[in-house]
């Protein structure tokens, strides 16, 4: 499996999260400081692995080419933008999945497809999630991408 975000590097999309759905525009209006990214591990429908946390910025990446109707920009070089390096263990997948399933049950039932995969996390949920993952190993986002590219 290709490491997360490698296709973004290859297509010049680092620093951009986009979607054609209006749900992303609604989320952008809430002025988020951070975006969390997750994947469903292969063969583990209904489970989530946290991949990264990116610091939101108003600045477009220098090489930004619009691909979607709505975009969020993140600062890939910020020390606050990280990739989680040990979040793939069964225990951590279960921790993340249980925490979020209790709060976003409908999204889990739809397996996070389409708009159901985009959710605002209220401050109390963010604080709890940050506490949950605070001891997970991380690497600065761009350093992690460089490692993934070899």
Language-model features: locations:
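Single-stranded nucleic-acid-binding OB-fold domains
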Residues: 44-46
